[in-house]
From Swiss-Prot:
Record-given protein name: Small ribosomal subunit protein uS13m
InterPro entries xref list: Rbsml_uS13_C, Ribosomal_uS13, Ribosomal_uS13-like_H2TH, Ribosomal_uS13_CS
Subcellular location: Mitochondrion
Underlying gene: RPS13
Key words, A-Z: Mitochondrion, Ribonucleoprotein, Ribosomal protein, RNA-binding, rRNA-binding
Length: 119
């Protein structure tokens, strides 16, 4: 996955692609978010990357960062909510153990060592 960093490399890598299909390659941006960004900014789905200017690129970059941060905050808030209500997965997060049913007898030794040191 790529990151959206530089205008020149983005345009040179995706010259013949549509803006929407070029944005799909960026980390943290999926088709649903791209469609939302297109509605907010008034993008044309069939506009080529080669016809894009720097102002449009910087606007897309700001929107992509905004949507990526929203998703990141949502995940963080969900984990904190589970910790707060102390359900099973929340307790596993608090104890720094595997959450999704992974094996702990032979794996996940490092977190369990750290827990023993704290106690």
């Amino acid at each position: 996955m790529k990151k959206l960093q530089n205008f020149n490399t983005f345009v040179s890598d995706n010259k013949n692609k549509n803006i929407f299909s070029a944005l799909k390659d960026i980390h943290g941006v999926n088709l649903k978010k791209i469609n939302k960004m297109g509605l907010v900014m008034g993008l044309d789905k069939f506009e080529k990357v080669s016809s894009m200017n720097f102002e449009l690129f910087s606007l897309i970059k700001k929107q992509a960062i905004f949507f990526y941060n929203l998703e990141e905050n949502k995940i963080f808030n969900n984990v904190n909510k589970k910790k707060k209500i102390k359900n099973y997965t929340g307790m596993r997060h608090i104890l720094k153990l595997p959450v999704r049913g992974q094996r702990t007898h032979t794996n996940a030794k490092t977190p369990s060592k750290n827990i023993k040191k704290e106690l």
